[in-house]
Amino acid sequence: MTDTVPAASRAALSAALRAAFFARAQPFLDARVLAPSDVHAVALTAPRFGEDDVERMLGLAFAARAPRVSHPGVDLAALPRQIDLAVDDDAADTDLPWPEDLAAWAAHTRSSPMVGGPDDALTPFVQQPRRRHPATPLLLTRRMYVEQDRVATALAARASSEMPQRARLDDLDATLARLFPLDAQRQVGSTDGPDGEAARAVRLAATRRLALIVGGPGTGKTFSVTRLLAALLDGGRELSIALAAPTGKAAARMREAIREATDTKAQPLLDVSDEVRARLQALPATTLHRLVGMRPDGSARHTVDNPIPAQLVIVDEVSMVDLTMMRRLLEAVHPEARLVLLGDRDQLASVEAGCVLADLVPSSDHRDGGTTGDAVAAAAGPLAGNTQTFTRSRRFESAPDIALIAACLQSYATRHPDLPPDDPHAALERALEVFAGTRHASQETEPDLRIERLGRPARAGVLTRPTETQLAQLAGPYLGGYAAMLVAALGDATPLEDPRWQRSLLAAFDRYRVLAVHRRGPLGVQQLEQALAQRVRAALEVGRGERTGRRGIDLGEGHWIGRPI
């Protein structure tokens, strides 16, 4: 147990210590790298543990900051190069007073009496060894460590448990041969081809209590899940199913994808009865928060003692699930139920702390499925036998340049045929060359149609503000599509209540997206959104007096189409 400072000494020490600590942290507060809450949390706790070293307290403030910026912990030695200072124009050029020897600072911070090991439950911070970097442990808050430990324990328990024989399909091979007719011509479950991956994914989810089905967009995850559902419902089996995703939009996409995958015209080879097809098309999908039953006070309706009433739980877009929500999900799913997690480790990360899927699944340079190969088993650890990785994306087969850029940016060096095998920096250069139009993928047939360059930065490596011409090009498709359709409808007798018109309007809106690499900075999401919004408002002001100001359509829950601007 850590010795504490007597109350009288603690009172005398606190004022001077707080003043020195806040003075040391002030440049980081001014640059908005640290928040007042990070500093106050350490300042209030330090006297209780006899911590009076300002440099160690600064390191602990960054550990307290980590969950606030979506990380469970921090490597202090690597911190300066990881911090994005472009939170505003002034902070972008700020020279922050980092300790001169970062490695020594990290080691010194870990020696604080406020930092303990995994088994020392009384300390507010924990140092956690890392397999890949054993010399530089992560520094975590105790809460984040406990969340990680509970997730790891729950996953390990579920991964080691197979479905009992009574819960398995009577003739899985025959079912797979029927659901994957192309595979049946070779060998069901074979490893040579994308259809083999799909069949293996279904076999995995049908026989294990935990299945991770991962891969990029268009690789066949939904295709496999639809056939898993068809296999489990085949023959009139009774099965309670819960479908969920982190957001309402993702849940709606999941539901729609399953409906499309079971459409008779779109999937004539899906050999299932009309009853099974109807059940699949009627399956609802909900948000993960609603599935777990989150309450306003932060508690959950479904827990270990009151599990989700479903025998099969499928969660899509798992890359967006944070550490705490994953822990809640694992505790809420019944121990006897199947849990299938779908996602792409390289897609959107969680907003809250912890990128669970990225930690569970090997990086994209491991291209073999989780059920094949010792290399993947070693990389994936105890979940290798519960993971199926999809490797071929049909979505980008007609756009090789885009596929090449994605492969470069995902991990610098993957097994893409157009990438150098062992030089990550060359892979990055290759991506920049494709962006610049000086190089193309070997299968690219329309190189001039894939990428439209909106200008070049004033200096290499410097983020500059977009020009008026660039903003006009970015806003053009929006103003000429969705906005033009909406303005026209508000100014004439278009029947706004017509469902066909509503679908057309929403489809026009869905065709416009501007994606940014950064959240902040001159080319980040926040400033681009503000700049584009100004142009849109200015364009819509033209002719405003000629519009009738019709109220539009109330879609419920505060959502409107056509509300006057």
What are these regions (language model features)?
Residues D3-D171, S319:
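N-terminal accessory nucleic-acid engagement/regulatory domains that precede
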Residues D75-A78, A121, P164-D171, G193-P194, ...:
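Short coil/turn segments at secondary-structure boundaries
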Residues D346, A353-P564:
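Conserved helicase motor core of P-loop NTPases
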Residues R200-V202, R208-A441:
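ASCE P-loop NTPase helicase motor core
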Residues V151, A205, T247, T287, ...:
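Conserved hydrophobic/aromatic pocket- or pore-lining residues that grip, position, or stack substrates
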